[in-house]
């Protein structure tokens, strides 16, 4: 999402007449590479049978046979390199700041996603395979974004040291306080802060215009320059905006199949995971807002996550999330993570294909 302010793209511009549900068994599907078993996923037998699902397929005249046009493939997208750094040193150190009240299960879910980025053992399609697209981006020396990501430190600010309403400036004060209290190192070369606010914390423009954003710290406020990202937990404030498709806006009514079931049963946090993925991909490829982005205005760049917002699988785009998977419990996902976790994470722009791509592509 664009930095410093992430513009929310409402990716559900479609009529309810085209809002229909298709499920196809993998036994009859030619794309058997997505078949998962109990042993490979380490999940209960009740969730062993996986099906492919696309709850918002395009009209039949624009079917999956022409899916490339729904995956953002375009020679008109001018994503350019502006000579700035990318996070290429290994590992990329993430310093997580938990602001507000966070439960252990919610923290565990987000940690598992972050740890899945470097976990090559997860079955395909996996989070680590998704991150390979981010690692295609290079700096002027030819160094790629690192494939290794590490949670290098954590700090819990459960007492809301800067109140329960934050702005883009006070978020830097939160970072400064956390850096001092947790004794985070000044990690210029390969570090970043990830500020996560709980469901009862409001942020300037949250729900109205942003679900998350990234920028860099100001020396005058934090003491040095370092990239950071902020993402809010929308579960009680605006799940229909920031946790879509696990929650639907009211104007959609009841003409379609309804919201999708989140892979870990947590609408707000499962939705948050995709926003975190979006922001991380943009931080590493454009940490100081002078590396990879489209458009001429660095104060409102279109970045590698923005170009694919709302796209989760093949056949998607133009208002459709694409073909994703569903287990027997009805939970939807498009990639596997560490320890049998499953996630639904948006695709990102592939500079080689000049299209959005993800590990669950069936083309």
UniProtKB/Swiss-Prot annotation:
Presence of the UniProt keyword DNA damage in the record: no
Keywords: Apoplast, Glycoprotein, Secreted, Signal
Signal peptide extent: 1-25
Subcellular location(s) of the protein: Secreted; Secreted, Extracellular space; Secreted, Extracellular space, Apoplast
Residues annotated as glycosylated: 144
Coiled coil: none
Parts of the chain that traverse the membrane: none
GO CC annotation terms, alphabetical: apoplast
InterPro entries xrefs: EXORDIUM-like (IPR006766)
Source superkingdom: Eukaryota
Induction: By brassinolide.
Alphabetized PANTHER family for the sequence: PROTEIN EXORDIUM-LIKE 5 (PTHR31279:SF4)
Cited function: May play a role in a brassinosteroid-dependent regulation of growth and development.
Similarity comment: family membership: Belongs to the EXORDIUM family.
Name of the protein this chain belongs to: Protein EXORDIUM-like 5
Gene: EXL5
């Amino acid at each position: 999402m664009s930095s410093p302010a992430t513009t929310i793209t409402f990716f559900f511009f479609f009529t309810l007449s085209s809002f229909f549900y298709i499920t196809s068994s993998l036994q009859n599907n030619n794309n058997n590479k997505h078949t998962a078993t109990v042993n490979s996923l380490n999940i209960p037998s009740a969730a062993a049978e996986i099906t492919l699902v696309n709850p918002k397929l395009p009209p039949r005249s624009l079917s999956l046979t022409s899916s490339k046009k729904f995956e953002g493939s375009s020679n008109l997208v001018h994503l350019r390199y502006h000579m700035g750094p990318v996070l290429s040193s290994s590992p990329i150190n993430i310093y997580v700041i938990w602001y507000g009240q966070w439960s252990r299960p919610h923290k565990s879910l987000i940690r598992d996603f972050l740890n899945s980025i470097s976990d090559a053992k997860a079955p395909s399609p996996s989070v680590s395979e998704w991150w390979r697209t981010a690692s295609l981006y290079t700096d002027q020396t030819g160094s790629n974004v690192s494939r290794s990501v590490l949670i290098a430190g954590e700090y819990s600010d459960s007492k809301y040291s800067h109140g329960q309403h934050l702005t883009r400036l006070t978020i830097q004060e939160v970072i400064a306080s956390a850096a001092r209290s947790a004794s985070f190192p000044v990690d210029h070369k390969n570090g970043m802060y990830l500020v996560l606010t709980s469901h009862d914390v409001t942020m300037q423009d949250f729900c109205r215009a942003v679900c998350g954003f990234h920028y860099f710290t100001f020396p005058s406020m934090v003491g040095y320059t370092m990239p950071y990202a902020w993402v809010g937990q929308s579960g009680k404030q605006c799940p229909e905006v920031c946790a879509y498709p696990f929650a639907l806006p009211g104007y959609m009514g009841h003409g379609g199949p309804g919201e999708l079931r989140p892979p870990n049963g947590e609408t707000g946090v499962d939705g948050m995971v995709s926003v975190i993925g979006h922001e991380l991909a943009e931080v590493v490829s454009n940490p100081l807002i002078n590396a990879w982005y489209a458009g001429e205005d660095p104060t409102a760049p279109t970045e590698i996550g923005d170009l694919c917002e709302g796209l989760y699988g093949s056949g998607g785009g133009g208002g459709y999330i694409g073909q994703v998977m569903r287990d027997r419990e009805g939970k939807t996902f498009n990639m596997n993570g560490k320890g049998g976790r499953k996630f639904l994470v948006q695709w990102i722009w592939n500079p080689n294909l000049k299209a959005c791509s993800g590990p669950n592509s069936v083309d």
